[in-house]
Amino acid sequence: MPGKKSPAGEFAARKLREKRKKFRWKDERYKRRMLKLDEKADPLEGAPQARGIVLEKVGVEAKQPNSAIRKCVRVQLIKNGKQVTAFCPGDGAIDYIDEHDEVVIEGIGGPKGRAKGDIPGVRYKVVKVNDVALSELLKGKIEKPMR
């Protein structure tokens, strides 16, 4: 009779636990997390927010069945020079952002750190313009400072 693959016994717990760990590498999410693959590919390098300079304003067409041009900006990050597209949330928000402004961007909050809703390929949103919160500019509480 051939031997058993698993150890059985009162003191076999450590061996059993180590054995189970091997199978976790078959799980794609576990593998990505352990090898830090998403962090390596992330333009923000794992940080929650990043500063950047606005290069240009761009209009991104919404995916079907919606029909709109979502107002976005191309931003060059200060810390590594990478370029990303960031969404400008709010009615008329794009009017408060000019080229060469310094903006702070953060993740847009889509599933698995990806794009949200009908805006294809846009993973970030603008939070601040020239060190003033975009939401405050939209409410009219603060005027945008000149840099």
UniProtKB/Swiss-Prot annotation:
Organism of origin: Methanopyrus kandleri (strain AV19 / DSM 6324 / JCM 9639 / NBRC 100938)
Subunit comment: Part of the 30S ribosomal subunit.
Entry's Gene Ontology molecular function annotations: rRNA binding; structural constituent of ribosome
UniProt record similarity statement: Belongs to the universal ribosomal protein uS12 family.
Keywords of this entry: Ribonucleoprotein, Ribosomal protein, RNA-binding, rRNA-binding
Pfam family for this entry, one: Ribosom_S12_S23
Domain of life: Archaea
Name of the protein in its database record: Small ribosomal subunit protein uS12
Record keyword Ribosomal protein present: yes
InterPro entries noted in UniProt: NA-bd_OB-fold, Ribosomal_uS12, Ribosomal_uS12_arc, Ribosomal_uS12_bac, Ribosomal_uS12_euk/arc
PANTHER family documented for this protein: 30S RIBOSOMAL PROTEIN S12 FAMILY MEMBER (PTHR11652)
Function: With S4 and S5 plays an important role in translational accuracy. Located at the interface of the 30S and 50S subunits.
SUPFAM superfamilies in the record: Nucleic acid-binding proteins
Cellular component terms per the entry's GO annotation: small ribosomal subunit
Cell cycle keyword on record: no
GO biological process entries: translation
Ranges in coiled-coil conformation: none
